[in-house]
Amino acid sequence: MGGGIALPAWSPGAAIAYLDEAGIAAAVVSISTPGVHLGDDMEARRMARVVNEQVAELVKDHPDRFGFFATLTLPDVDGAIAEAAEAFDRLGADGVILLASVAGRYLGDPAFDPLMAALDERSAVVFVHPGPLAGPSVPGLPEFIADFLLDTTRAALLMARNGVLDRYPRLNRAYCDSQ
């Protein structure tokens, strides 16, 4: 399940067939919520590397059909910076995916500035996706209807209010599920 929606089985062949049927030239692959950081920095670093290497192989096997956004290790900022460098320099990532909020902090929090600076130096594409909800969702209202929209919108607003967009103008941002 992804935010209350049953997800279909995925394979490269099925994805390419869907792209062809829909008239879509290529797709960008990434993983989203909950990401790879489940409480342990070292395990998150290991998981991010495994995920990114596997997705890079998919792209290598189908370079005209797939690109990828690298998975990082926030709230582990040092690990995220290291994995971003690895993903761009060795694996050929097209960008990174960041969760709008992690461990109670939203993008725009000064704690994430070192990562934003590193990504800004590369003029990186930063795809922002809703994070795990900080509190319970509204009963009878699926998370994807309102909560996800609010999560990415809050991240975008905090990034603007806290000067992230001014300090790091070369970040190429895309917000998923925002208003």
Feature names for model-found ranges:
Residues 1-179:
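Helix-coil boundary/capping segments in enzymes
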